[in-house]
């Protein structure tokens, strides 16, 4: 393998990753498809209307439960990211020109799907003068204008920590402002070379100071130790993070970081208990948990804790 699917030459890191075959999943990494009436109706509607969600396109294992709750996730900014994280399946490259009509289309999709809660995430757009801040903020504004009763969670990149860009995004007032730290300090640069651990914590602190409910995610199985996970949880809580999800890394392809360890379900239970003891108001941890899983429920839980 010398060329990535998007046509670019593989990075040396990707070539090295590809030397390790794709790992066999343990027996507890299994999904049961429970297709309830809300899920069935939503799937039919999405097909009929030609709508696009991260839930389907990324093959999320939790789609059955989330759609049954009328929750879905949308990806904005295109399908090419200006940064590369070693766990992420989104392609790295030169993004297409900014699509200024995208916020309206996402808002229309939210209305057509009758969503109670929508998560919006996107690619990093370091090619744009504002890093994509307007696009993220405008998508929230468009959803809220067209769907005033729908909760919105916004999962953002770090916008290089620029206060003006963060202020633009925070001003759109999503119900939850999420920024995922993803891993622990020791291996952070190896996994997320275009981000910094400290800056990610600072983004969460700034969002909390702006009066927003804050959320982050940790991916396990990238080479961290249990003690490092506990330290990262304490760092996140200290930074003002309200909600935490803890997940198992599943390798998207051979060119991505190998799975270092399959974390057992009982370990996730222990990490969740530790997070609750630290004072997080919303906690979900498990092998198949993803950062937008049960997002609406976690928000309501955190909002009640604040009241």
Curated annotation (Swiss-Prot):
Boundaries of each Radical SAM core domain copy?
A: 67-281
Query: What does the note accompanying the cofactor annotation read?
Result: Binds 2 [4Fe-4S] clusters per subunit. One cluster is coordinated with 3 cysteines and an exchangeable S-adenosyl-L-methionine.
Q: Which UniProt keywords apply?
A: 4Fe-4S, Cytoplasm, Iron, Iron-sulfur, Metal-binding, S-adenosyl-L-methionine, Transferase
Q: Which CDD domains match?
A: Radical_SAM
Instruction: List required co-factors.
Output: [4Fe-4S] cluster
The family database entries (NCBIfam families) matched by this protein are listed as: lipA, PRK05481.1, PRK12928.1
Question: Per its record, how is this protein called by name?
Answer: Lipoyl synthase
**The organism of origin for this protein:** Mycobacterium avium (strain 104)
């Amino acid at each position: 393998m010398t060329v990535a699917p998007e046509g670019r030459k593989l990075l040396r890191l990707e070539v090295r990753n590809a030397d390790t075959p794709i790992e066999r999943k343990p027996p507890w990494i299994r999904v049961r498809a429970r297709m309830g009436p809300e899920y069935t109706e939503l799937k039919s509607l999405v097909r009929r209307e030609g709508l696009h969600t991260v839930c389907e396109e990324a093959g999320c294992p939790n789609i059955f439960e989330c759609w049954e709750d009328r929750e879905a996730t949308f990806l904005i900014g295109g399908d090419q990211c200006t940064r590369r994280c070693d766990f992420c399946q989104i392609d790295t490259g030169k993004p297409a020109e900014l699509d200024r009509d995208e916020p309206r289309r996402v808002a229309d999709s939210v209305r057509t799907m009758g969503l109670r809660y929508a998560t919006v995430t996107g690619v990093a757009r370091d090619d744009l003068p504002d890093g994509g801040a307007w696009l993220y903020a405008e998508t929230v504004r468009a959803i809220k204008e067209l769907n005033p009763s729908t909760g919105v969670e916004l999962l953002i990149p770090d916008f290089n920590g620029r206060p003006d860009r963060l202020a633009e995004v925070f001003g759109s007032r999503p119900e939850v402002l999420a920024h995922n730290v993803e891993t622990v300090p020791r291996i952070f640069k190896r996994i997320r070379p275009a981000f910094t651990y400290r800056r990610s914590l600072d983004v969460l602190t700034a969002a909390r100071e702006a009066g927003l409910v804050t959320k982050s995610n940790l991916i396990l199985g990238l080479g961290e130790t249990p003690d490092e996970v506990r330290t990262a949880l304490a760092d996140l809580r200290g930074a003002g993070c309200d909600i935490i999800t803890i997940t198992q890394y599943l390798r998207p392809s051979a060119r991505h970081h190998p799975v270092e360890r399959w974390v057992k379900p009982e370990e996730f239970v222990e990490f969740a208990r530790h997070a609750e003891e630290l004072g997080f108001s919303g906690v979900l941890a498990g092998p198949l948990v993803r950062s937008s899983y049960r997002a609406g429920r976690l928000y309501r839980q955190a909002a009640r804790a604040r009241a």
